[in-house]
């Protein structure tokens, strides 16, 4: 299996909803032509009120899709880590997905949550992870994804 070299930093709890809650759109104010797998980096940014309100609003949607209930205390420690990977299969400016709002939506498929988070400095937009981070990601991805 090929592990992507590119990563995308996503704020809490959105990254958790992508990997566990059925979130099939990542909203951005810029479009992308990129298609393929990308590592998901959990941003260190933390706005308690925003995270809480997001979890209250979108948590039930994720739970209807079979995701377990999650708390802020469970999500917060993962900030500053690569936590999984997902495929970007399209970019749209309109969608019927309940997860879509904003200017552009990266259409997502095949999320994989990693067993152990891998510490990594994030960046804006797509960014390339360092060789040592890639090595740690490869070491645990083995059986997670065909």
Question: What are these regions, as identified by a protein language model?
Answer:
Residues 1-146:
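Structured alpha/beta reader/binder surfaces that contact nucleic acids or chromatin modification marks
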């Amino acid at each position: 299996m090929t592990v992507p070299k590119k990563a995308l930093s996503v704020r809490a709890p959105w990254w958790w909803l992508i990997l566990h809650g059925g979130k099939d759109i990542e909203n951005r104010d810029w479009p992308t032509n990129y298609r393929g797998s990308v590592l998901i980096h959990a941003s260190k940014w933390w706005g308690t009120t925003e995270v809480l309100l997001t979890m209250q609003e979108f948590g039930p949607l994720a739970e209807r899709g079979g995701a377990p209930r999650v708390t802020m205390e469970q999500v917060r420690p993962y900030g500053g880590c690569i936590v999984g990977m997902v495929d970007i299969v399209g970019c749209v400016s309109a969608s019927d997905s309940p997860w879509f709002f904003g200017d552009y939506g990266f259409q997502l498929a095949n999320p994989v949550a990693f067993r152990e988070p891998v510490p990594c400095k994030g960046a804006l937009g797509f960014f390339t992870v360092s060789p040592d981070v890639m090595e740690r990601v490869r070491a645990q991805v083995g059986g997670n994804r065909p």
